[in-house]
């Protein structure tokens, strides 16, 4: 993991098209702004984990493909 230090209003750039800016620092909380292309999904980790759990549950409950012949 790369660890970077940034101050308020400083940023980092990922892959030339994703910019992360430190918007605010208040106590032990940091607010970040993310500029990314629309096709790049950006989620808080807890939201991402919930999406993954929902996708796994959907896949587990999805009917078998009718083209599958055993």
Curated annotation (Swiss-Prot):
Name of the protein described by the UniProt record: Translational regulator CsrA
The record lists the lineage as: Bacteria, Pseudomonadati, Planctomycetota, Planctomycetia, Pirellulales
The cross-references to HAMAP family, in alphabetical order and at most eight, read:
CsrA
The record's annotation in SUPFAM superfamilies points to: CsrA-like (SSF117130)
The record's subcellular location field reads: Cytoplasm
Give any GO molecular function from the UniProt entry. mRNA 5'-UTR binding
Q: Which organism is it from?
A: Rhodopirellula baltica (strain DSM 10527 / NCIMB 13988 / SH1)
Q: What does this protein do?
A: A translational regulator that binds mRNA to regulate translation initiation and/or mRNA stability. Usually binds in the 5'-UTR at or near the Shine-Dalgarno sequence preventing ribosome-binding, thus repressing translation. Its main target seems to be the major flagellin gene, while its function is anatagonized by FliW.
The UniProt entry's sequence similarity note says: Belongs to the CsrA/RsmA family.
């Amino acid at each position: 993991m790369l660890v970077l230090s940034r101050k308020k209003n400083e940023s980092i750039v990922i892959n030339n098209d994703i910019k992360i800016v430190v918007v605010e620092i208040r106590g032990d909380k940091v607010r970040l702004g993310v500029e990314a292309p629309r096709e790049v999904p950006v989620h808080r980790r807890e939201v991402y984990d919930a999406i993954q759990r929902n996708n796994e549950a959907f896949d587990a409950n999805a009917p078998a493909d009718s083209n599958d012949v055993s």
